Amino acid sequence: MIPQISQAPGVVQLVLNFLQELEQQGFTGDTATSYADRLTMSTDNSIYQLLPDAVVFPRSTADVALIARLAAQERYSSLIFTPRGGGTGTNGQALNQGIIVDMSRHMNRIIEINPEEGWVRVEAGVIKDQLNQYLKPFGYFFAPELSTSNRATLGGMINTDASGQGSLVYGKTSDHVLGVRAVLLGGDILDTQPLPVELAETLGKSNTTIGRIYNTVYQRCRQQRQLIIDNFPKLNRFLTGYDLRHVFNDEMTEFDLTRILTGSEGTLAFITEARLDITRLPKVRRLVNVKYDSFDSALRNAPFMVEARALSVETVDSKVLNLAREDIVWHSVSELITDVPDQEMLGLNIVEFAGDDEALIDERVNALCARLDELIASHQAGVIGWQVCRELAGVERIYAMRKKAVGLLGNAKGAAKPIPFAEDTCVPPEHLADYIAEFRALLDSHGLSYGMFGHVDAGVLHVRPALDMCDPQQEILMKQISDDVVALTAKYGGLLWGEHGKGFRAEYSPAFFGEELFAELRKVKAAFDPHNRLNPGKICPPEGLDAPMMKVDAVKRGTFDRQIPIAVRQQWRGAMECNGNGLCFNFDARSPMCPSMKITQNRIHSPKGRATLVREWLRLLADRGVDPLKLEQELPESGVSLRTLIARTRNSWHANKGEYDFSHEVKEAMSGCLACKACSTQCPIKIDVPEFRSRFLQLYHTRYLRPLRDHLVATVESYAPLMARAPKTFNFFINQPLVRKLSEKHIGMVDLPLLSVPSLQQQMVGHRSANMTLEQLESLNAEQKARTVLVVQDPFTSYYDAQVVADFVRLVEKLGFQPVLLPFSPNGKAQHIKGFLNRFAKTAKKTADFLNRMAKLGMPMVGVDPALVLCYRDEYKLALGEERGEFNVLLANEWLASALESQPVATVSGESWYFFGHCTEVTALPGAPAQWAAIFARFGAKLENVSVGCCGMAGTYGHEAKNHENSLGIYELSWHQAMQRLPRNRCLATGYSCRSQVKRVEGTGVRHPVQALLEIIK
């Protein structure tokens, strides 16, 4: 039995008083003080961990102003505040103690756009890709690019002055910020925009907080103009935080306070809104993917690409390329970046040309390719091949791979993981190759592996050395390397922070700015935040206050993780290896990961949040001397003793009375998971939440009783076959209003599915497919076996959507094969989802033995529901290991593609069909939609893939009363709109859950693709 974890870091009374008074004064946002909420805000995309006291989620600038006004009260003068955006920072920019002000949950409105003048006004929590999705119909985009664009907020981009691919042409975020609305500590609203210097000087004479800010910045930047110009490196990635260089324009006629706030990392004010310059979308985009025999060759050849008038040049090394090859993302780009025969591709330059004149762009591309051919022929520059990508969809797929490369590095095998701490250094591009050669020599001298990729056109390369932060000695080495890289960048006239901000690296600021200029930064900080209450420890302390700076060797995630025994860390790798990349925060409703995060906007309900909580849970167990591995081994095979039952009942009674246990917070996070498994493939680190969720639930329920619904779900494969013998009787009973009401109130289940009428057994009466014995199958000759297909049943389709199985049997017959309906054998997935892992292992072993016996017949076995078929491949393998055997159950599309391989493709005509894939299917097997389309094409039918996220049903998730609202909300995010615009009778869904959800919400259902094929085939 797991122990009660009754102690968690508490919240000081002053913070609780502040939050209470904040709500009393009309705050309309959310506040959070639970340990789980605070833990999810204690990390970002960096190696650091710092627990805040509380989190607030404002809904408007007025809410932020209320926070700032209340904070200025004398009784709260000791509290500190840190703004936070998407949490994608790689250096702890938004990590701090005190109160986190999260702008991402609610402040995500696009306020107005002026296409004629080319600007848009947004709230700070708008996500970069969200804005570009909005701008696309107007023919515009927000130009600064970054790899985390689908979850990074514009407020975060402004605060770190982010930039990435294309910065040589498009510049940094600050080059596109026309003005901001910021709230000062005290509640004053500061609106910035470029001003004539005379007006700025006049504003500085006002005896107000804003007046003093204008005066300080105006005077310091004017008086120290020459010092600033002399000390700021002449780089595309100029020195930010605070950008004294660009407050005045070159002619000294214009003054813009915005430049001080961009890159300020929340140390000066709360930026709540911004007016942004937007750029016309280029009409033509081309990529030339240039392949090299070494990474050094790729680096040294990059200036040549820039001279060819390319928009951007992105470089990727062999380590990143190889990790991409092992990831599901490679499926989308493999034809665009093919291998060169008899050559090893160890470096890649992704060269983009863009503009409005197609002839001009093609001329530049052709000229480059001709020159590349010359280099290949003469064996120069290490060029071994090239490919041109002319289609926009292909261009976007390659950049998606490049963006995912950041996270893929974290998926390197072993305890040492490539980590960010010196990952955005910038040097003049002409020195980059020599600089990187020295950088690599430094890392090689310590015997470290590393991955490299980046923006070679701008002199920025992302370098992530592999270190084990659970090893104290490697943590010390990280600081040593960091110090050495500071010296190395200085040697080449570069910067340690080229695009990701300073964060915990601010301790190096005096070395880059010089003491005299650093003193000027402190004066600026003092004008905005004299008492050092906004994100203290970052950028610089205010003048007149001897306050400490954050350090590179501050407390890290590894500091906590190393407290968990190594064996536990290894066995719970799924939770331990989350590196915080945050891809699970993807805003796009059409992205399958993560539906619970999308609907709740609560990061507890994301793979990263769940992994964070489980890591802390494991640490707290270790702190109490409890070994979860031993507990798992000691679990009884079946049943529980009376003493255990009494103990669980007592513990559950105390829990219902409000007795605290951190395990309850973890359980709440796990209960929100739909177990769709999108994270297990879409996450670059392959964080498999359903797997460690099941293990957690199994251990959690050693202490607490399971709800009745869990037992009903886990035994569905036992009672469904019995109920299917009299489906009308049971349906009549289930349909009674009183039964449904009692089910919702006492079991917690709603909208219970009805059994199929007629049942599958009734439909198959007299059909030869249902009456073949094993002996008859074994007696078939080779030719007969080659034409026989074994249909594997699953509990949901066979008993609740039997027509699909019956139609598949008929389809197999129609194609000239002999279908044989195998006896139903429980799959066990429902047991796995609910954490009945011992029971699941028994079910899996029994069914695996049966299917292995069938596999020996040498006939294909096929199932129609993706989630259940893929369970044989994934969960069975994890549960049984080698005992699983070698049996293989094919999906319907896999078998059809093979069976129809020799059939010619017919002329496509008529109305389209529309394919809605199951989350588990399209993420684990991304080629499935195309495979289905190819199958339909063989019969002259067009099948279009519909890009949607999760349907919200996910097995029994949508039937649980506590999930009902979220289930319907998830459906509304993408499925409902698609169903409304497409003809329902032409929509097809492979998942039983998906079809059930459509019928529940829309009133009429959709069919399985095999049913459409049965109709199509003449």
Swiss-Prot record:
UniProt-annotated binding residues for (R)-2-hydroxyglutarate: 402, 500
Cofactor(s) listed in the protein's UniProt record: [4Fe-4S] cluster; FAD
Organism annotation: Escherichia coli (strain K12)
Gene ablation phenotype (knockout): Disruption of this gene leads to the significant accumulation of D-2-HGA.
Family: In the N-terminal section; belongs to the FAD-binding oxidoreductase/transferase type 4 family.
GO molecular function, one term: D-lactate dehydrogenase (cytochrome) activity
Domain 4Fe-4S ferredoxin-type: 662-695
Record keywords, A-Z: 4Fe-4S, FAD, Flavoprotein, Iron, Iron-sulfur, Metal-binding, Oxidoreductase
Residues binding [4Fe-4S] cluster, per UniProt: 673, 676, 679, 683
Record protein name field: D-2-hydroxyglutarate dehydrogenase
Function as written in the Swiss-Prot or TrEMBL entry: Catalyzes the oxidation of D-2-hydroxyglutarate (D-2-HGA) to 2-oxoglutarate. Appears to be the only D2HGDH in E.coli, providing the way to recycle D-2-HGA produced during L-serine synthesis by SerA, by converting it back to 2-oxoglutarate. The physiological molecule that functions as the primary electron acceptor during D-2-HGA oxidation by YdiJ in E.coli is unknown. Shows strict substrate specificity towards D-2-HGA, since it has no detectable activity on L-2-hydroxyglutarate, L-malate, D-malate, L-lactate, D-lactate, L-tartrate, D-tartrate, L-glycerate, D-glycerate, glutarate, or pyruvate.
EC number(s) given by UniProt: 1.1.99.39
